[in-house]
Amino acid sequence: MSQPIIVWFRQDLRLDDNMAVAACVEANAPMIALFIDDRQHERQAGAVSLWWRDQSLQALADELQRRGSQLILREGDAASQLNQLIDETNPQAVFWNRQYYAESIARDTAIKADLQARQINVESFNSTLLFEPWQIRSKTANTPFKVFTPFWKACQTHGIDTRIWDAPMQFLAPSKWPQSLALTKTNLPEGAHALDQWQPGEAGARKTLHRFLSENIHGYADGRDFPAKPATSRLAPHLRWGEISPRRLFAETSAAPVSDNDQRKFFAEIGWREFSYQTLFHNPNLKTTCLQPKFEAFPWREGAEAEDDFEAWKNGTTGYPIVDAGMRELRQTGYMHNRVRMIAASFLIKHLLIDWRRGEAWFWERLADADPANNTASWQWVAGCGADAAPYFRIFNPIIQGQKFDPEGHYTKRYIPELTGLSGKMLFSPWLAKSDLLENANVQLGQSYPKPIVEHDFARNRALDIFKALA
């Protein structure tokens, strides 16, 4: 029997359309599937995302077992664990799919040099993105794009590969399996009790895609902004851990009976993910440093009052129902509707003047789909300090946003049942309701539901004055 190949899984917890797995199969070699919990060289995933990862690893292990293989689990420094496994199994090669953030790039570069010095063949592949983050560049300046629209146009002009590789139903096994740690399960943080709606793993990702293409994508271009409608793909957590490839999303959506408008909008959302990874690759300090340096001088609020406001925002007790509904959805489900993410992020940054990095860290901790590129790039976009960022004067009015995008109040009342008796404008600004209306709705401001922690017009003008001074 030929020597095995170690396939090191990381952010690619699937078998189909996995280029490292494909290369192993094409080499006709036994596969040793490896996952290393390396917390030293990667930004530690938040509690909810770790919960998802552990569920996904179990699904991957089960699928490998059905196909005559196993998942080998190790923990600790990746270089040390790889070298130890090499000593145990004498492989002909080590394959992996590339990651694109600074810590992983530095680690992988060092490991590749070390293994090559040991005469071990090392190959890496792109199985995470449609394009490598260095691939699409401005033709005029030969530099990375800083604006999304021309970037995505260049991607489409280049052409998107939609060929899908399907994994075999049976893998070659090594003559002897190495030892593996047992799978562990991360406990969910306090308050996260409604995650049974998800099915982590490759099979769950495929089901989610097929449900989206058969039902929710119709009317997606407009409906995706309304949080009460089932009009989003809900694929983000599956993409986060590589349970499905963006190439498959493109291929299957292209083949589905979908309107051009809905298809174009969905593809653009995949494009934003590509743009975020390009931005992160070329700006490795993205999670800590504003892309526009002038924003480093922004006078963020600090002190006891700001801390109280930050806690109110995290807990969904700001007194602005659409913001609070989103923050409670996040706490309970590990997810927040995209439109509401923008509203909640804008409120923290522009109403409360609290550093976007603190909001990014909270989303990182509580989102199942907390992605190293998307999460940071999105927060910088809302703050106005990132690539192709929202203009500083775009300050969402949370009252109007609620009325416009949750007109029946179904989403808001789902997460704030104490306001079930209110409707229309009063639902989104209960402090303006007359006392008899509040009494009939069984709402006691300051007791059953909080009063606003800041007045909108005051907060808006305060933020505009500061942003204008920086502009």
Where are these regions (language model features)?
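Glycine/tryptophan-enriched, flexible segments
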Residues: 120, 141-296, 405-406, 410-471
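Short secondary-structure transition/capping segments
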Residues: 78-90, 114-124, 169-183, 386-391, ...
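Trp/Phe/Arg-rich N-terminal binding region typifying the photolyase-homology
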Residues: 1-163, 262, 374, 457, ...
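Active-site-proximal binding-pocket segments
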Residues: 230-424
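Alpha-helical packing segments of well-folded alpha/beta enzyme cores
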Residues: 20, 56, 60, 205-212, ...
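Generic alpha-helical segment signature
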Residues: 53, 202, 228, 316-319
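Bulky hydrophobic/aromatic packing residues
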Residues: 48-55, 73-74, 95-100, 125, ...
